């Protein structure tokens, strides 16, 4: 499955204009970043997301693209992105974004930039449903209010609310199904308010629901701004530091050496249950430390045969996914390899680049050092290798 997201930020914000004159809601600053950026960061932290298409107002495309470029430089998304101009209607903006997807894309998420509270967990549940074969997936919440059908101020009927749900974004689709639905609506001149409606009108695909999130509101009315400010107070981010340490012995019957996910040709064998990547093990422990989740041995015990020669990068990615779902924002990683052999210098740049790729941090946010213990201790006697890691992060806490 090759998934991209369309982030719709092309609206005119007519219903909220009086509360924020001169600024469209998708560009309102919240937690020191425009509203649309929070959704972009969330989407980029979902491991199965391959890229994002930003859809901006045509008259702001150049300015908004420069904004994304600057934001990405400071807090890297870590995945490819493009920016395109939208249209007069929501479906026109979606069509514009669909036209920019790469050839290998086969599934797409469509998300409103005005929903900054959608979580990575919700996004993953949508992707899980798509991976299981669904062609259209929408997050939905049961309707708790009684709904009336009204015409000219007069109540015509009261639908059975047990059959009603309120749908949200992101909405997920098979790309071919969504393209076909868009063509159908264009040919029939049909106007819709969401993409799932297009599949319903085409009548060839089933749209299923997953449980939505009550917190995933859409900023639409002036009073919603109050909720934004309230959320900012309730969901504060506090700095935290995680520390990791790992050691492995050398042995002629050990596994081929890997450091930071990079094979070290000619390095001594490493005795380990998994692949023995001491650097990734230390980093994994440090990330777990930021979340208060113990250590790598608790999550991936060496008594479990499933982790025999397990790829440490896969284990680290699983922990990073937990961190993203928990709202942990990793800002800096500092790593030290301590060993007499092999010399790390020939491999340093490759290791550094790979750590940046895995953590989705820019080069200035990952520091890698190597040192010896001046021939003292077990590393100095060339009996083993150790690594330490310090991770700095922002953790979301509720006041």
From Swiss-Prot:
Pfam family, one: IspD
Domain of life: Bacteria
Keyword annotations: Isoprene biosynthesis, Lyase, Metal-binding, Multifunctional enzyme, Nucleotidyltransferase, Transferase
UniProt pathway: Isoprenoid biosynthesis; isopentenyl diphosphate biosynthesis via DXP pathway; isopentenyl diphosphate from 1-deoxy-D-xylulose 5-phosphate: step 2/6; Isoprenoid biosynthesis; isopentenyl diphosphate biosynthesis via DXP pathway; isopentenyl diphosphate from 1-deoxy-D-xylulose 5-phosphate: step 4/6
Binding annotation for 4-CDP-2-C-methyl-D-erythritol 2-phosphate: 246-248, 273-274, 295-297, 300-304, 371-374, 378
InterPro entries cross-referenced by the UniProt entry: IspD, IspD/F, IspD/TarI, ISPD_synthase_CS, MECDP_synthase, MECDP_synthase_CS, MECDP_synthase_sf, Nucleotide-diphossugar_trans
Site feature: Positions MEP for the nucleophilic attack: 161, 218
Residues flagged as site, Transition state stabilizer: 15, 25, 273, 372
Function (record text): Bifunctional enzyme that catalyzes the formation of 4-diphosphocytidyl-2-C-methyl-D-erythritol from CTP and 2-C-methyl-D-erythritol 4-phosphate (MEP) (IspD), and catalyzes the conversion of 4-diphosphocytidyl-2-C-methyl-D-erythritol 2-phosphate (CDP-ME2P) to 2-C-methyl-D-erythritol 2,4-cyclodiphosphate (ME-CPP) with a corresponding release of cytidine 5-monophosphate (CMP) (IspF).
One GO process term, biological-process aspect: isopentenyl diphosphate biosynthetic process, methylerythritol 4-phosphate pathway
Chain positions covered by the region annotation 2-C-methyl-D-erythritol 4-phosphate cytidylyltransferase: 1-239
Family, similarity comment: In the N-terminal section; belongs to the IspD/TarI cytidylyltransferase family. IspD subfamily.
CDD domains: CDP-ME_synthetase, MECDP_synthase
Protein residues bound to a divalent metal cation: 246, 248, 281
The protein's name in its UniProt record: Bifunctional enzyme IspD/IspF
A GO molecular-function annotation: 2-C-methyl-D-erythritol 2,4-cyclodiphosphate synthase activity
Catalytic activity from the UniProt record: 2-C-methyl-D-erythritol 4-phosphate + CTP + H(+) = 4-CDP-2-C-methyl-D-erythritol + diphosphate; 4-CDP-2-C-methyl-D-erythritol 2-phosphate = 2-C-methyl-D-erythritol 2,4-cyclic diphosphate + CMP
Annotated segments matching region 2-C-methyl-D-erythritol 2,4-cyclodiphosphate synthase: 240-399
Coiled coil: none
Organism: Oleidesulfovibrio alaskensis (strain ATCC BAA-1058 / DSM 17464 / G20) (Desulfovibrio alaskensis)
UniProt-listed Enzyme Commission number(s): 2.7.7.60, 4.6.1.12
Cofactor: a divalent metal cation
Gene3D superfamilies in the cross-refs: 2-C-methyl-D-erythritol 2,4-cyclodiphosphate synthase, Spore Coat Polysaccharide Biosynthesis Protein SpsA, Chain A
